[in-house]
Amino acid sequence: TLPFPLPEGQVELGSYSGGYGSKGSYATGEVIGTNRVRFTSSKPLAPNEGLTIVVSWPKGLVAEPGMGQKLRWFLADNGAALVLLLGLLIVFTWYYLAWDRVGRDPQKGVIFPRYRPPHRLSPAACRYVLSMSFNKDAFTAAIISLAVKGQVEIEEEDKEFTLQRKPGEPLALLSPGEQAVLNTLLPLDSSRIEMDNKNHERFQSARKALTKALKKEYRGRLFKLNGLYVLGPIVVSIAAAVIAAFFQGGPAVWISYLVLVLLLHLLYAFLMRAPTPAGRVVMDEIEGFKMYLGTAEQDRLDRMRSPQMTPELFESFLPYAYALGVENTWCNRFAREMPREVRDQSGYHPAWYHGHLHGMGALHHLGDNFSSSFSSAIASASSPPGSSSGGGGGGFSGGGGGGGGGGGW
């Protein structure tokens, strides 16, 4: 039954019957009355067979919907996608404008070799400021700095490490972060601790104490995270998802939105971090110092007129080399430039490290294997124990695409 009368002699009937995709038919159709048609099959339909009917009439018999109706249909079918797309555009625009305002880094200065670290910056602070974030390398550098400064002895046996506090050593040369690590990890003069995850709570507390001290000293003064600028886009992205939930939207729409919006948040959370003008100057100094520590070629060192290598100079800068990732080059340079009197006295013997290697073997070990094994031990010690749609038109059986005279406005 159709909702309007059919013009006599201007109606065409057709049908397709059989299995999916069949072009044949064993059904006939006829017009009954002014608005009814009937189709009769000459034999029963077998399992998995279907009947598709086709009724067509002259164009203009049914009024074509206006633009308003088409727009309403379009919004009903694609409302969720449009709302989410608008949300993404707002989030991106917000982030870009915020980044353009506060997230652009000041222009980097000229980087040239510097023979001293920036004034009053500890190794952990150099790592923290240069990366504008805290990571395990800063914690590793802080412990090695405590050892080099005579506060801690590092004992290694079969890649197992133990830290022993040395009593009576002055604390004046320690940075606030290093003091926080020492007081948390080894609070008493004779404290001793194995770098094992059974002691993870103390290592985690020491790591948090170092992070807190570094944040207090340098965040906001040398660099800014500009985290408040991220809150608005997060609210917009959540609001867009809530509004879109009232419209139709398939899984592909939601998955695409979640992936894109998360990428935007992560990208701009990183890009919004920016050094202050004073911080950019300090970063340039750190990079210049790293250039000096990481230079291996002798001719370049000669042109740089670098200071004469001594055991004292080597040890004082070794924690910085660990912090900046150039410890191998720094240790190899000392092995090559080691003063003759040190070689004649059976090589280098660090007072703060006790392991199975001595002399030149210990020196090469500090550069090659110690960094990775010690960092892995710290990471381990800081962690708790193991802890669809239907067939479209096209005129075949089961397709359902011929009925209603498709397209005949």
Give each language-model segment a name.
Residues F74-L86, A244-L263:
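Hydrophobic alpha-helical transmembrane segments
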Residues P65-W73, A239, V253-L263, W352-Y353, ...:
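Extended beta-strand-rich architecture
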Residues K23-S25, G60-G232, A269-E315:
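Short, amphipathic alpha-helical interface elements at domain boundaries
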Residues T1-F74, L86-L89:
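Intrinsically disordered, low-complexity linkers and stems that provide flexible hinges
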Residues H200-S205, A209-R219, S237-I238, L263-W409:
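Short hydrophobic helical membrane-anchoring segments positioned at the boundary
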Residues Y229-A245, S256-H265, K290:
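Hydrophobic membrane-spanning alpha-helices of multi-pass integral membrane proteins
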